[in-house]
Amino acid sequence: MASLRRGFGSDQTTASDTKMHYRQLAPTASVRVSPLCLGAMNFGEAHKARYGECSKETAFSIMDYFYSQGGNFIDTANGYQAGESEQWVGEWMKSRDNRDEIVLATKYSTGYMNHEKDKIQINYGGNSAKSMKVSVAASLKKLQTNYIDILYIHWWDYSTSIPELMHSLNDLVVSGQVLYLGVSDTPAWVVSKANQYARDHGLRQFVIYQGMWNAAMRDFERDIIPMCRDEGMGLAPYGTLGQGSFQTEEGRKQREKDNPGRKFGAKSLPYVEVSKVLEKLANAKGKAITDVALAYVLQKTPYVFPIVGGRKLEHIQGNVAALQVALSEAEVEEIEAAYPFDAGFPHTFLSGTLFDGAKPTAAQGPGDVFLTKWQGDIDWVEAPKAIRPSGQ
């Protein structure tokens, strides 16, 4: 057996040799990715007034560290930093000669030529076939590659038909320019309709959804997560750290005083209240508050790959450490008790909490439907659970 293992290359690097173990992207996508996805929105200087400053040297050091820890999943978009983000990621992959090791995601839909004011802008954005064609061609050039692992539509424009969208995306897959399809910032009903159209016509389906989700902004849980579970899709949430709004009490006071970095993001009461619970749990575990915030989304449901990004190397170093933070069910419940999340109708109708004055909760499966319970006691198969931190 030992000789057989040697014959199959047992001296090759295994998952245990790296800091991060890999996971399958989705039930419908067998590509293997690191549990964290490195977001490259901050890589560039064109929009530093909005996002804060990040030099090319710093961006390369962040990507080098992420790669050294086993990170192979990188997310960018056609319009980030007026195209500099894609350019820098492409230059980094070229200089490190590691393109085929990286699972590279980019997006189209946002107008990416806005910085060239002399051009007619109208078809450089949106979901149309033309916008898709010119954007992908430009992205391939900037990224210095001949294929994109995951192409997202960046947001739904409410004007492109499902047939036009899915046939155009499928053409990119058939041509070899794109391997997998993703969708971002789009209503759940649109994604379900698009995937059903793709199934009915033998086309490639969306396999991953990207959207905003964190412990103080849980709308993702209302329809997006159930839809992805049913469609066999992965989840790539952004804003998992509250866009910097999850702060310790001391950090929050200091930030209000200095106001550095990005100039937007929620500062509402839910973030303050959730931060208090995150800080309490972090102190008890000897971890950073951001570690607990990341652990929350990682351990809520399977196939979750948080997009983590920052302008400083220490940001991503801290994010990798969060993979070893385990939360109990009681700790998750404590976080969720910090502010009332109402899943709304029909979810609270199905759970029965719409009528009984109890805390509003959503029915997550057949065992939660109160009218079914009236018919008798039923033992249901449990839904798949998230992967726990290694060693837990």
Swiss-Prot record:
The record marks 107 as: Lowers pKa of active site Tyr. GO terms for molecular function: oxidoreductase activity. It is an enzyme of class 1 (oxidoreductase). The keyword NADP applies. Keywords: NADP, Oxidoreductase. Its EC number is 1.1.1.-. Residues 242-263 are annotated as: Disordered. Disulfide bonds: none annotated. Residues 249-261 have a biased composition (Basic and acidic residues). Gene3D superfamilies: NADP-dependent oxidoreductase domain. The active site is at 80 (proton donor). Induction: Expression is positively regulated by the dothistromin-specific transcription factor aflR. NADP(+) binds at residues 75, 184-185, 210, 239-249, 311-319. InterPro entries: AKR_Detox_Biosynth, NADP_OxRdtase_dom, NADP_OxRdtase_dom_sf. Pathway: Mycotoxin biosynthesis. The keyword NADP applies. Norsolorinic acid reductase; part of the fragmented gene cluster that mediates the biosynthesis of dothistromin (DOTH), a polyketide toxin very similar in structure to the aflatoxin precursor, versicolorin B. The first step of the pathway is the conversion of acetate to norsolorinic acid (NOR) and requires the fatty acid synthase subunits hexA and hexB, as well as the polyketide synthase pksA. PksA combines a hexanoyl starter unit and 7 malonyl-CoA extender units to synthesize the precursor NOR. PANTHER family: NADH-SPECIFIC METHYLGLYOXAL REDUCTASE-RELATED (PTHR43364), NADP-DEPENDENT OXIDOREDUCTASE DOMAIN-CONTAINING PROTEIN-RELATED (PTHR43364:SF7). Belongs to the aldo/keto reductase family. Aldo/keto reductase 2 subfamily. This is Norsolorinic acid reductase B.
